[in-house]
Amino acid sequence: MKTLAYLLLAAVCFISASAAENEATFVILPDTQTYFEQCPEVFESQIDWIVKNHDSIDAVIQVGDLTQENYPAEWYLAHRMMVRIDSVGLPLSLNLGNHDIGSRPFKYSDTYNTDLANRYFPLSERSGKPYWGGNLHEGRIDAHYISVDAGGANWKIISLPFGPTDRELEWAGQIADSHPDSYIVLNTHAYLYCDSTLIDGKDYWKPTDYGYANDSLRGCPNNGDGIWEKFVSRHRNVIAVFCGHVLKSGVGTRVSKGVNGNMVYEMLANFQRGVEGSKMGGEGYLRIATFHFDTKELEVKTYSPWLKRYHASPAHNFIFKNVDFTNYTTHE
């Protein structure tokens, strides 16, 4: 009963407050793919809520699998909805998951082809945003980063596609190294498994199992363990990783120490059809991650604008305490 009262109070406080100077709040949109397949009105309720509460949000992070079948009609609808986030001036980090990649619709990462994603979310549109940081691949959004000022600090949110290559991880490292005064957040589709370990060669749904792993022009993809080893663990200013992709429980949480002593807060959240207990494509659940500088906490809540309630499971509502924000950057 106390938990329910807390969550109801948190909802009122979030909706009524504007983005505070001493905290940074990011909304994470987990895999949205089966909303387009079954019930786009549920996804629309998420966008409605984000737009309504945009003054309390510093950025929106969509973790990939925006579409289910990589079909033009899905991309058209996705763009029509997502530009509403643009319309209120909110920074948006997009990600390309395995369902957003392929030689044609209904092919899931059989080859590395993101033409449809780049047709409906063209670089010419995304790079015109004031928060745009840069991109790796000429004329494409596949690997990019955005720059967000929140909580009195600067954040670089780096988006790397499903199974990033060594080249993409090296580029991400260059972004982190060239911005030592910025907190780094990684947005990538496949990173954690549902047992809260890094996706590796033993797990289902690992990037190296997909056909595009044999695309010689693309290069070999990395699973979660490769992403950790080659990028996340090496840079002092990396503070968080958000991902989706994995089914079963669709949830995982891990805190890891990088080689420079910084703690990295890593979170998997997925509610799509196929996840245990999923209804209506995911019932509209999204994540709200708030970094509280004053109390040294990272607070995570999971809310459904469609159901108008918080998730009942403690696995989806929790607080990381004693976050040493001074241990990441040269920013004071």
Give a label for each model feature.
Residues P72-E170, D177-H179, V251-A269, Y285-I288, ...:
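Extended active-site neighborhood of metal-dependent phosphoesterases/phosphodiesterases
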Residues K279-E332:
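A short C-terminal boundary segment appended to hydrolase-like catalytic domains
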Residues I28-P30, D58-D65, P91-N98, L160, ...:
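Active-site neighborhood of phospho(di)ester-bond hydrolases with catalytic His/Asp-centered motifs
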Residues H179-V238:
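Active-site-proximal segments of metal-dependent phosphoesterases and phosphodiesterases across multiple
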Residues G211, L217-F293:
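Conserved beta-sheet core of the metallophosphoesterase superfamily
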Residues Y35-E37, Q68-Y71, L96-P105, I141-D142, ...:
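Active-site environment of divalent metal-dependent phosphoester hydrolases
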Residues E21-T25, D55-V60, D86-S93, A150-I157, ...:
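Loop/turn elements at helix/coil->beta-strand transitions in domains of secreted/extracellular proteins
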Residues A17-E74, Y204-K206:
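N-terminal active-site segment of His-dependent metallophosphoesterases
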